[in-house]
């Protein structure tokens, strides 16, 4: 990857160059194909970057469940990745995550990249509620009789049940240190 600017975990560079390790709803298990990708791609790329190589990641949960459950899932998914990467000999000091249980910023980025027709409406609702709370979810569910919520649920929420990771030179990583 040839990147010359800071990479944030919500920008298109990260989204396009990271691998989403996607989880089943309410689960934290990592698939065999993802383990193969880590072994055959991620680790060699990280080694090629030398001492400055880190893994940049974003651990998330989709917003359809209760917020406390989404917090638990995002943290547990991060812990699952840490444990797996540790088994491959990767020190957690070389892993930088944003942990975002209900990832509305990433949802908006994905919608923008897809030129989704509902983006302006969804963005307005998310901003109105400052990206938090049950009122935000309730309002999204009411829009157009649930049509927009169902669209988000089918098209984008599966992508939010993930830990997205990529190898990168640490000088190019721009992470927001959130409490784990």
Label for each model-derived stretch:
Residues 2-5:
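Sec/Tat signal peptide C-region and signal peptidase I cleavage site
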Residues 7-33, 51, 93-180:
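Periplasmic OmpA/Pal-like peptidoglycan-binding modules at the C-termini of bacterial envelope proteins
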Residues 29, 41-44, 48-49:
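Alpha-helical transmembrane segments of multi-pass membrane proteins
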Residues 46-49, 80-84, 120-124:
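Glycine-rich loops and low-complexity Gly/Arg-rich segments
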Residues 47-75, 85, 96-105:
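Short, surface-exposed beta-strand segments enriched in small/polar/acidic residues
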Residues 71-72, 84-89, 113-115:
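Terminal non-domain segments
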Residues 80-83, 87-91, 99:
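Short glycine/proline-centered loop/turn elements that form peptide/ligand docking sites
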């Amino acid at each position: 990857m040839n990147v010359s600017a800071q990479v944030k975990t919500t920008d298109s560079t990260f989204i396009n160059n990271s691998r989403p390790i996607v989880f089943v709803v309410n689960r934290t298990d990592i698939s065999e194909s993802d383990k193969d990708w880590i072994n055959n791609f991620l680790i060699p790329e990280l080694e090629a970057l030398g001492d400055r190589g880190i893994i940049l990641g974003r651990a998330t949960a989709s917003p359809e469940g209760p917020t406390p459950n989404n917090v638990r899932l995002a943290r547990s998914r991060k812990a699952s990745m840490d444990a797996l990467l540790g088994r491959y000999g990767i020190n957690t000091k070389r892993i930088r995550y944003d942990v975002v249980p209900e990832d509305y910023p990433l949802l908006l980025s994905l919608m923008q990249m897809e030129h989704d027709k509902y983006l302006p409406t969804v963005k307005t609702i998310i901003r109105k509620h400052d990206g938090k709370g049950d009122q935000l979810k309730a309002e999204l569910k009411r829009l157009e009789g649930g049509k927009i919520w169902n669209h988000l649920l089918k098209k984008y929420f599966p992508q939010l049940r993930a830990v997205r990771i990529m190898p990168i030179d640490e000088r190019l990583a721009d992470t927001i240190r959130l409490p784990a």
